[in-house]
Amino acid sequence: MRKFNSHSIPIRLNLLFSIVILLFMTIIGRLLYMQVLNKDFYEKKLASASQTKITSSSARGEIYDASGKPLVENTLKQVVSFTRSNKMTATDLKETAKKLLTYVSISSPNLTERQLADYYLADPEIYKKIVEALPSEKRLDSDGNRLSESELYNNAVDSVQTSQLNYTEDEKKEIYLFSQLNAVGNFATGTIATDPLNDSQVAVIASISKEMPGISISTSWDRKVLETSLSSIVGSVSSEKAGLPAEEAEAYLKKGYSLNDRVGTSYLEKQYEETLQGKRSVKEIHLDKYGNMESVDTIEEGSKGNNIKLTIDLAFQDSVDALLKSYFNSELENGGAKYSEGVYAVALNPKTGAVLSMSGIKHDLKTGELTPDSLGTVTNVFVPGSVVKAATISSGWENGVLSGNQTLTDQSIVFQGSAPINSWYTQAYGSFPITAVQALEYSSNTYMVQTALGLMGQTYQPNMFVGTSNLESAMEKLRSTFGEYGLGTATGIDLPDESTGFVPKEYSFANYITNAFGQFDNYTPMQLAQYVATIANNGVRVAPRIVEGIYGNNDKGGLGDLIQQLQPTEMNKVNISDSDMSILHQGFYQVAHGTSGLTTGRAFSNGALVSISGKTGTAESYVADGQQATNTNAVAYAPSDNPQIAVAVVFPHNTNLTNGVGPSIARDIINLYQKYHPMN
């Protein structure tokens, strides 16, 4: 028999005690680390587990014209707000809605059948009975397991009969409130729509808000776009119910927005969203040890967003609108504008790109109604006509087809198997030599056709056969130069969704040739204004800019001090020499001041208060009954030797072929500007 060794017991006990002591020391060391050495870290973790932060948007900044006149306004109002905890059940929300209805008014609740069903199923007993009555395939999956709660709920909603949703008008008002409360996410705050609150209602709700968990009084705002000639470019703002646009929600959320935040959805409101958006208020929700909402504290006050001031003086803008309307009515009276969509004009500062006016009069061809349409200057496209001929000559210089003020023979152009292409005076004057300056002054089509042929690597010969192997590359060269002036490309204006023109990918040789004198590609009035502004600015293309600067708020919430002056954005410089640009300047000057019987634009200078340089343009078209019409266009800048304003005018489908009103309108716009803002 084996002997028991009693001496080993103390050794084992000592080992066991040593292990226990070591474990205790480890625990004590860990506690020391947590409670002494890293106390702040764990206190923050404990606090974060018992509190959460929510943000709420503040009123947007406002938009003003160049003189400080408001184009939009915010109306502040007191509203009911609701902050939801994660412990609130549908039953709790029903009770809150019922209490709240005794203190607010609801005029005409607009409810969907789904909202009625949600309220009906908010009763736990009813919901239980509805689910139990569902057929097995609506409760269980193919393996016999209970469906997820969301699937069960949707099936329960589908099974509710319309006959079960008969409610009184007062009950519908309660349901209307319940639906809004139920739409607020956990630890989020939403505004509850009611009739406008009076002072008494605000005081009562504020005093008893503890009886309705999550309910409080807060300040909200309504956005109103004032009725002005610039209303269409202001844009719109989403409602709190709509919140973030679905297609942009992810990007906004990354910037710290909430799903129900109101944001700009179009034009200036969208372009300057982050400037106009108010600073969010931050609230901290404190939870008790059971996870119930204990208190809500404001830790960061919100503030109204910054304001923007435009480059456009509303008084000048309105005067241009009135001028356009007067000219259009005159053309209506003589029958010339019956089929015209309206008349548009843009004025820019050629050096800074500041938009001085963007005016449009839209003509409803069915009703005959005339309405302001400033937005049409960046969204509507038109055939430009001869105003683009300076760009064609520039392409000739850029590609080595023309040299300086080169002389070509102005003659009838006849290609094999095609009808003649003439200038407006060819039949009366026949063939004669003509320079680039004269080609602009007289508005020669045939000078442009010969330049376009040169881009194809060919020289004009009467009745010649034209090979088209270089057609595509020639059109690319021509359009590339046009793009340097802003034609057929983005202007860089500070508005979203501007049209870049209509520049067809499919075209024929005939399309290419007529494009050289402005009879194919279509451009917006803003693009034409940038084109002439680029010429006035010695070939430097500057992005049009509607906003002059960003401003803070004064003590009353109105336009405050300047925060940031927006600077001009140079897009590019046209790739021609200074001497060649001087030829364009000479040509534009001669258009308005030439003494030849072929000078095309003396209307620019007749009655002008300052020296004007410009270019006329007519684009041939036909209207509904086959009657011939023209787009009567014009571009101009002034003063000729120190340009401070550049203007483009488009008057489409005018059947009064002998009345070229474009130059007269451009002249009168410049005269108006001289009266409002005298130029040196």
Curated annotation (Swiss-Prot):
One of its GO terms (biological process) is peptidoglycan biosynthetic process. Gene3D superfamilies: DD-peptidase/beta-lactamase superfamily, Penicillin-binding protein 2a (Domain 2), Penicillin-binding protein, N-terminal non-catalytic domain, head sub-domain. The active site is at S386. Residues 1-8 are cytoplasmic. It holds the Pfam family PBP_dimer. The keyword Transmembrane helix applies. Residues 314-680 are annotated as: Transpeptidase domain. It is found in: Cell membrane. A transpeptidase that forms peptide cross-links between adjacent glycan strands in cell wall peptidoglycan (PG). Part of the elongasome machinery that synthesizes peripheral PG. Structures 2WAD and 2WAE are from strain 5204, a clinical, drug-resistant strain with 58 mutations in compared to strain R6. Belongs to the transpeptidase family. Interacts with MreC in the elongasome. This is Penicillin-binding protein 2B.
